[in-house]
UniProtKB/Swiss-Prot annotation:
Keyword Repressor tagged: no
Subcellular localization, as worded in the UniProt entry: Cell membrane
Record-annotated membrane-spanning stretches: 12-41, 78-100, 120-142, 162-184
Bilayer disposition of the protein: Multi-pass membrane protein
Organism: Treponema pallidum (strain Nichols)
Keywords of this entry: Cell membrane, Membrane, Transmembrane, Transmembrane helix
Keyword Transmembrane part of the UniProt annotation: yes
Protein name, per record: Uncharacterized protein TP_0149
Record-level GO cellular component terms: plasma membrane
Length: 197
C-alpha cells in the first residue's frame, strides 16, 4: 500500500470520528462501539474471503452485505443480553455503521488499497481514547459496561475549568485541533490537502 493511500485513509478516519461524538460520552460506550466496529470490519473480510472460493463474482457483494448485516444484528443482540442499558445508547450507531458499509459496497467499486488494518486500528484507538478522556474530564471517572448500566472503576472530582472539552462541541473542536496538528506535522513530507483530493 502506498504512503499516499495510508495518509488519506488516516485523514478519513479522523473526519469519521465526528459522526460518533454523541456515542462516546463514556468509556463503556466507546469500548463497545470499537468492538462493534471491529466485528463489522472482520465479518466483511471473512465474507470476501469466503466469496473468493465458493461464490461467483457477481454474487460476492450481496453475500458480503448479508454477512455484514447478520454480524451486526448478532452483536447488537449480544449487547442487549449482557448490557441492555448501554445497548439503548449504542444501537443507532451500530446500524448506521453497518448501513454505511452496505451503501459503500452497493454504490462504489471495491478498491483493495482503500482499506487497511492501520486505518481501522487508528480509528478504534482514537474512538476509545476520546471516550476515555471525555469521561475523565466531564465526570471524573472511568466506567465499564455492566448489566445494570455502568461500573465505575476510577472516580475523582472533575475539573469545572476544562469540562467544556468533554461536551459534544468541545470534542469536535478537539478533533479539529488534532486534525490541524496531524496535517501540520506532515506538510514537509506530503502534498497539500487540496492536492490529495
Amino acid at each position: 500500500m502506498s504512503k499516499y493511500t495510508v495518509k488519506r485513509a488516516s485523514v478519513l478516519c479522523i473526519f469519521g470520528i465526528g459522526l460518533f461524538v454523541p456515542a462516546t460520552g463514556t468509556f463503556a460506550c466507546g469500548l463497545l462501539l470499537v468492538l462493534g466496529f471491529w466485528v463489522l470490519f472482520f465479518s466483511s473480510l471473512l465474507a470476501r474471503f469466503l466469496s473468493q472460493f465458493f461464490m461467483r463474482t457477481r454474487s460476492a457483494p450481496l453475500f458480503e452485505v448479508c454477512l455484514t448485516l447478520s454480524a451486526t444484528i448478532m452483536y447488537d443482540n449480544l449487547i442487549q443480553g449482557f448490557f441492555p442499558l448501554v445497548r439503548m445508547m449504542l444501537c443507532p450507531y451500530l446500524f448506521i455503521t453497518a448501513l454505511s458499509r452496505t451503501l459503500d459496497l452497493c454504490l462504489t467499486a471495491y478498491d483493495a488499497d482503500a482499506e487497511s488494518l492501520e486505518c481501522v486500528g487508528v480509528f478504534g484507538i482514537m474512538i476509545a481514547g476520546i471516550s476515555l478522556v471525555r469521561e475523565l474530564v466531564a465526570f471524573g471517572c472511568v466506567s465499564l459496561p455492566a448489566p445494570s448500566g455502568f461500573l465505575r472503576i476510577i472516580s475523582f472530582p472533575p475539573s469545572n475549568v476544562i469540562r467544556f472539552a468533554a461536551t459534544g462541541a468541545g470534542t469536535l473542536i478537539s478533533c479539529g485541533i488534532v486534525l490541524w496538528i496531524f496535517r501540520s506535522a506532515g506538510n514537509d513530507h506530503t502534498p497539500s490537502l487540496r492536492s490529495e483530493w
